[in-house]
Every structure is written in C-alpha cells, then in structure tokens.
Amino acid sequence: KKVLIVLFSVFVAGFYAQAQAQKVNVVSVSKERDIHNFYTMMKEAFPLAYNDPAAPRFIFFDDNKNFIFGVGGYVQLSGVYDFNGVEDYNFFTTSTIAMKGHQPGASYGMTVGQSRLFFKLVGNTDVGRLVSYIEMEFQGPQNTPKLQQAFVQFKGFTLGQAWSTFGDMTAVPTTIDEEGPSSGIEIRQPMLRYTYHINDRWQSSLALEYAKASYTTGKNAESIRQKVPDIPLNIRYTMKNGSHVQVGAILRNIGYKNVVKDKDKIRTGWGVMGSGKLNITSST
C-alpha cells in the first residue's frame, strides 16, 4: 500500500507541474525530434548510478508535444553457487556470512529480483527543466515490486526518494550484485534537496533527508522515531573530459529512549567523505 501511495503521489506532482508549465508558454520539444537528442535529454536528466537504468526504450509525447514520457528497464537473472552460506543471493554482504561451524553449507540459487522497471517524464519550460521519475525493483515477497526511487526535480530542487546527497553514486564502480564495494555510501532516502550550479565546472547540493536509524539498544535503551533530519552537503568539480572530484559532509542526530530515566535522548554525529572518477579514455 505504501508503494502505491508513493507512486500515485509522485505522478500527481509530476503531472500537476506539467499542467502548470503549459500555462507559462512551454518550449516545445518538437524542435528536438531526432532520436539522438531525445536519448540525450532522457539520459542527462540526472546523474546515474552504475546500476541505474539509462534512457527508456519507449517514448510517448503529450498532445502538444511539450513533454516526453518514457518507459524502460531491464531483466537481470543472477545465478549463484555458494560454498559458505551467503544469506541473500541479491546482496553479497560479507558481514552476514556465518562464523565457521555455523554455516549452512553449500547451496545454489537464482534470482531476478534486481530487474528494473522505471517511468520518466521530462519537459523543458521557459523557467527550467522538469523531471518526474519512478523506479522499482522486484525484491519484495514473491518478487513483488519494491520502490527504489520516486522524485520530482525542478529549478534545482529534488523532492522525493533518491540517492543520498552524502554519497557519490557516479563514482561507485560496477559490481554484479547491488551491495557494491565496501567503501561505497549507497542508500536511497526521502529528501528535500537543492542543487546550485555555480558554473559549468562547479556545483553544490544541500539537503534534508529522512534516515531510519539502526543501532543496538541493550537493556537500558529503546529505539524511537528520529526527531531531526540528516543534513548532508557536497560540492563537486567536473573536468572537461567528464572526470570529477567531490567532497561532502553530513550532520546527523540519532535519538533513543533512556529507559532508566524515562527520557528521550539525542546524540549528534558528523562525517566527511571524498570521492572522484578519472576517465582514462573517452569510452571509460
């Protein structure tokens, strides 16, 4: 039910913005009818992670050809033969491998849970580009759909669920499974983010993100709902050949309940990160 509510809400926001844009003399995309321009328009709407689907295979126009709507995705079949008891065939999480003597033994499995389906609405207006995007996988019970991303972008603002601002998904190397490298900050979170393009090379983002805290409470503490959002910030420099360097910081407050004193407590933490990508050749 939550997935359906989010899907409906994002599409309502997207189509409402489309209706508003048409009232302010929308620039028709019919001037960019060739396939290459449409492909580029769809692909460059926002940065992609290594396993995000790119441009859609099917594109539809509205009546006035002001906006384009794409549907795409892919089917991914993964087969695994494990010797030491991996818990999940979709995610190679080394910390979940059982200790020696407690492993269930060798096993074989297949999964299509990482297959993707997405919908993207893109349009150019006199005041900026509008993007509405929904993406889902099939990792729910019995391979039912599971929401991955759902957001609207306009005038530098991103509203919805997307990759965290603290991470740099365009710098994460390709892996077969979705767990990715151990050093990667890979998480999708509900957020309100603003990205400011300083010039052709520099840009910066600031966000408020909702994070679900996960921690061990012990006997004298209990988990509670978080009272303060995460506040991540990053700044990015992009070179002429597409290589980039990014640094970021995050301020986080984690709340818990002190059972002994029957009071809610908040602890503040922070973090910094640095990342980058170097394109050795033009096809890197």
Pin down the residues of each PLM region.
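Detector for outer-membrane/organellar transmembrane beta-barrel domains
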Residues: 241-284
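N-terminal periplasmic/intermembrane-space "pro-region" immediately following the signal or transit peptide
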Residues: 18-81
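Intrinsically disordered, low-complexity segments enriched in Ser/Pro/Gly/Ala and basic residues
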Residues: 8, 27-29, 242, 282
